[in-house]
Amino acid sequence: MTHAIKSERECQRGFRKNLCVNWDLIHLAETTSTNDICRDLPAWTAVRADSQTRGRGRFGRAFASQKGGLWLSASLPATGPAEVWAGFSLRVGASLLTHLKSIGLTAARLRWPNDILCGSRKLAGLIIEQPASGQLIVGFGMNVLNEPWTDSPELSDTATRLADWISPVPDLETLTTGILEALAEAHTQMLAGGMPAAIEELNAHWTEPLPVEISLSSGRTVRGSFLGLAPNGHLQLLDQTGSVFLVEHPTVERLRELEG
């Protein structure tokens, strides 16, 4: 177990923007799922694996996790009322996007709720689980040097990797440090401002109407132009008549971008 993040003394010198959290980092060569390992770990502990055999995304979807990518999960405290953490995945997505842009990935953008894309191809994604009261598990996966389409040819038209967008590519240790710092910042911001501040930041990324198709948990499918989030976190869509309607975010199983 190692400390992946700078010490508190370094924090005081300004390296951590006053977010003085010392993460304990466990590094594994291979595991089934870093999220599963994190379930039994205390807050501010993270697990990184070189590869996963049963990585997963939202709704239990399989997530390719080859060696050369960044596969990371972190255990965070969920203190206070449950409503404080409603929409935390959106807050995390905004913080991670800001961080990736800061290291030179200017092409990065966010697809609701928290997929990170470059162009039309998926670079990274995250999943947030709450296995126990008072605990949040954030799982983050990003293609870095790996080529996911070699194991999953169906990803050849939909996936990308960091090495195709920036050079030189930061090493996995440096990337891990930056991601954990972004998670700590998202946690602090959520406690301070909840969802309203996150929604404002997210809507600043979603400035142009985007044609989408949304699959709902009821089995229905709706189409419209995605306009961002309403103050309550629901999705705002513009229909063909020019009317704006809301889609409740808990009912959304998948959002697919359409050709404009």
Name each region found by the language model.
Residues 134-164:
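Short, acidic (Asp/Glu-rich) active-site segment that either coordinates a divalent metal cofactor
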Residues 164-219, 257-260:
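Conserved, helical-rich catalytic subdomain that frames metal- and/or nucleotide-binding sites
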Residues 50-52, 75, 117, 129, ...:
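A generic structural motif
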Residues 1-105, 208, 257-258:
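N-terminal lobe of the biotin/lipoate ligase/transferase fold
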Residues 208-260:
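Conserved RNA-binding domains used in RNP assembly and mRNA/RNA metabolism
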